[in-house]
Amino acid sequence: MTSDWKEFTLGDITDLVIDYRGKTPKKLGGDWSKSGYRALSAKNIKTGRIVQPDTIRYVDEEMYQKWMKDEVKRGDILITSEAPFGQIFFWDSDEKIVLSQRLFCVRIKSEYDPRFIYYYMITPEFQGELDGRATGTTVVGLRQPELMKCKIRCPEIQNQKAIAEILSSIDAKILANDKINDNLQQQASALFDSFYKRAIVEVGFTEIIQILGGGTPKTGESSYWNGLIPFFTPKDV
């Protein structure tokens, strides 16, 4: 029962916060590299995923040592502070990375299961509190002190681990299905491209389609409404 769960602030259960949001290679006397250590920024984090891999930059060994006085470790939680705001990622790798723009790294105390904390942080309850603590109008962002005030509710450690294991297995299945779908989409695209290149007849798009315009029944005519046939508007598509 969740009524038995204890409530803490994120700061209560956090061992370390890594925050290098103001750093850049130029400020450290260097520049980006063509290869080396990946530098992840907020735009590369979407809850549960690394995205836009083509935008990821790199630094060499010397720059990495200057930049990352505290290193990201397996089990850490990455949180975007703005643009986009409130995206969460569980770092489940031994790869060494650089924390770049608009990104916090939170390390949870050993008495708590970090994967469970990650799953709690992506719940509507926690995300709603993040929204409430954010500031800004044009660009919405979150300051570290406000992040640490956010509330976390936890069961006993054995239950944390059990819940995290179940949710992790579901995530793994989703990821596997996504990879299958990506592969099928690539195959379909390649097959279509092959057919397209062999086409010998070219026609205009409007020659093979029929365009139908919609309308709205009179709202004052009750016989037009509350029937069994669905009525779609643009917002339903």
Model feature map: region roles:
Residues 41-42, 58-126, 143, 233-234:
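A short beta-sheet element
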Residues 1-23, 149, 153-215:
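Non-catalytic DNA-recognition/assembly elements of restriction-modification systems
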Residues 3, 81, 97-104, 115, ...:
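A short glycine-rich beta-alpha junction/loop motif
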Residues 52, 99, 146, 187-188:
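N-terminal alpha-helical segment
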Residues 7-30, 43-74, 206-222, 230, ...:
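Sequence-specific dsDNA recognition surfaces
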Residues 45-46, 83-85, 135-136, 214:
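Short glycine-enriched loops at secondary-structure junctions
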